[in-house]
From Swiss-Prot:
Heme b binds at residue 195. Substrate binds at residue 165. This is Peroxidase 66. Residues 1-29 form the signal peptide. Ca(2+) 1 binds at residues 72, 75, 77, 79, 81. The active site is at 71 (proton acceptor). Keywords: Calcium, Disulfide bond, Glycoprotein, Heme, Hydrogen peroxide, Iron, Metal-binding, Oxidoreductase, Peroxidase, Pyrrolidone carboxylic acid, Secreted, Signal. One of its GO terms (molecular function) is lactoperoxidase activity. SUPFAM superfamilies: Heme-dependent peroxidases. Belongs to the peroxidase family. Classical plant (class III) peroxidase subfamily. It holds the Pfam family peroxidase. Glycans are attached at residues 85, 96, 211. The modification Pyrrolidone carboxylic acid is found at residue 30. It comes from Zea mays (Maize).
Amino acid sequence: MAASVSASCLNRLSSLAVVLVALASAASAQLSSTFYDRSCPNALSTIRSGVNSAVRQEPRVGASLLRLHFHDCFVRGCDASLLLNDTSGEQSQGPNLTLNPRGFVVVNSIKAQVESVCPGIVSCADILAVAARDGVVALGGPSWTVLLGRRDSTASFAGQTSDLPPPTSSLGQLLSAYNKKNLNPTDMVALSGAHTIGQAQCSSFNDHIYNDTNINSAFAASLRANCPRAGSTALAPLDTTTPNAFDNAYYTNLLSQKGLLHSDQELFNSGSTDSTVRSFASSTSAFNSAFATAMVKMGNLSPQTGTQGQIRRSCWKVNS
């Protein structure tokens, strides 16, 4: 009898999972690269201009925008919930406390520019998705087609930021976190390549440089010189070779055990993803292609479409 009940529960859970995947797929199917062609034909050029201007002034903006998009999408989908200034919302949670404010400032500025051209038409979620792509391109990385038509969430979801894998994650934990979002191991390794730009605080990698053995000794020593064991908010580039260029140096660094975060080096540590890291390290085009594919998949995670949510007039607050 117990076995029968258990089987029944499993069948119901399986059916629910199928329904949820189907709903997510249906929402993604409503996205289109031409969504604003008639309603706001200058939307994409306005976003691109804003991103390029910001990156020229501060190259790290590209990494900030990319990280915002990732952190937004991994919590209940790409709905701009992360952008809401809610004191008890997503921004207040541990995984998001190190997000640089400049990313939010740039998105809010671009939103204001888009609103001046097409008021009430273009969502913050779409602006962030496009800005992340344009930031990568501005730093020499690949481009990809961003599907559009996302709407903005009316709430922030602090309780689900645990979906974001921490920098202390093992390979198994990384694979599990990405699999939960229907992203495969190749997607995971490719998206981790976003760490070819940007910086991290010492507190994010102190355990790695003081306690791990799978790290180049000279590299660890150089980092310890600026990062006391007790931790600090000092910064180090995620890619020490070409920190402001979107390239495949992140992977060549991993081959030399120069991954800044524990989770970075886990990708090349005698595990199942070693061969993918070698492939990306030896071929920029292979990395660029896989990264673009993975970004499209991630950008299509559980969007709000149709009459769901709203088109916020300001990205930092819901419409009154």
